[in-house]
Design a protein with these regions (language model features):
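AMP-binding/adenylate-forming catalytic core of the ANL superfamily
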Residues: 8-10, 18, 23-24, 46-134, ...
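Short coil-to-beta-strand transition motifs
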Residues: 1-3, 41
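Acidic/polar alpha-helix N-cap and adjacent early helical turns
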Residues: 167-176
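Loop-rich non-cytosolic ectodomains and luminal regions
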Residues: 14
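Short secondary-structure edge/capping micro-motifs at helix/strand boundaries
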Residues: 31-32
Length: 176
């Protein structure tokens, strides 16, 4: 972006500075001081630069999963792999401070009760993932995440903490 600098912090957060960026939050010094540090706007997004120096956004910093081995895993790119299948309508990957990743899945109407087909999709996707990014188990949910249940934002993003709370028992059962 012209006249804008972009770099990554040590934890891969995207930092931006330039004349076209906001100077701070209106009448909110506390939020401004948390967001703009030494002239750099901390976006809250995680990213990396590819071989051609293009910036790839990995997901939100506050959505990062840190497994029991201390590895940081961005769930959004993994979820996108599963959502590329028509048979998967919704998915949320979970595994914070856990030994492996699991998922809540809302399958499409066509395969709603076909756990074998969902398992086949998981096996297919997992074949191309590193060991720590493989989704070992999943739970088929009966109802989709929704705005009405407070599990989705108005822009249809998953409210992970609320879903984790609502499905706590189901998620924990995947670690037994």
């Amino acid at each position: 972006i012209h006249l804008t600098e972009i770099k990554l912090s040590k934890d891969k957060e995207i930092l931006v500075r330039g004349k076209s960026l906001m100077q701070g939050y209106w009448k909110d010094k506390k939020s401004t001081d948390k967001t703009i540090i030494n002239g750099w706007l901390h976006t809250g997004d995680l990213g990396l630069f590819d071989d051609e120096n293009y910036l790839k956004i990995l997901g939100r910093k506050n959505e990062m999963i840190v497994n029991s081995g201390g590895e940081n895993i961005a769930p959004a790119p993994l979820e996108d792999l599963f959502l590329s299948y028509d048979e998967i309508d919704q998915i949320m990957i979970y595994g914070h401070e856990k030994p492996y990743l699991v998922a809540l899945v809302y399958p499409s109407e066509e395969i709603k009760e076909n756990k074998k087909l969902v398992r086949k999709i998981f096996d297919e996707v997992n074949n191309n993932l590193s060991l720590t990014k493989k989704i070992r188990k999943f739970y088929l949910i009966k109802n989709p995440f929704s705005i009405e249940s407070s599990e989705l934002t108005p822009t249809l993003k998953i409210k992970r903490r609320i879903v984790e709370k609502n499905y706590h028992k189901e998620l924990q059962s995947l670690y037994k």
